[in-house]
A protein has these predicted regions:
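N-terminal membrane-targeting hydrophobic helices
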Residues: 1-169
């Protein structure tokens, strides 16, 4: 899934109004942060590092939440709850829209990539920055259902954004 779609997912989670408005940036960042591994990945296929495994986020967020609990700091606990929800949403949407690499749901117990639709790993043997140009971009949009899903997420987020402002009296 492209970054804009992950950001849209974070925005949609924020719009559920689970926590106060001050947490908006954390919702957005948490839905995107697993993709930071693209900065050190040499190819699209290698882009799903430990940051794309649920065990990493379960351990990190549990430890963070527990520290917040011990210190009796609600903000710390809230931060790690949002981080967990956002990163899990990221992994789930990557699982749904996988084209070249799936999600290792059971890592480190096994190294199997799980995906909803068939993937073509060899199409991901390109530098991560070449995702935005053909031929990868053309390949990415071949699956019309997955493309429609991403476009739908973005449209819903934009509609909610532009129509959620209160109108002056």
């Amino acid at each position: 899934m492209f970054i804009n779609s992950h950001l849209a997912t974070g925005y949609l989670l924020y719009k559920l109004n689970i926590f106060e408005k001050k947490w908006f940036p954390i919702w957005i960042l948490s839905a995107w942060i697993p993709d930071i591994d693209g900065l050190w990945s040499s190819s699209v296929v290698e882009h799903h590092s430990v940051l794309h495994t649920q065990i990493f986020w379960i351990v990190l967020c549990s430890l963070g939440w527990f520290i917040g609990h011990l210190k009796k700091k609600l903000n710390i606990k809230t931060f790690f709850i949002i981080l967990f929800i956002g990163t899990f949403a990221h992994l789930f949407t990557d699982y749904i829209t996988a084209r070249t690499v799936g999600i290792k749901w059971l890592y480190p117990l096994n190294d199997v990539d799980y995906f909803l639709y068939p993937i073509i790993p060899e199409n991901g043997n390109i530098p991560i920055w070449k995702m935005l140009v053909p031929p990868y971009l053309t390949f990415y949009f071949e699956n019309k259902l997955l493309t429609a899903f991403e476009i739908f997420l973005n449209i819903i987020a934009l509609v909610l954004y532009f129509f959620s402002f209160k109108k002056p009296n």
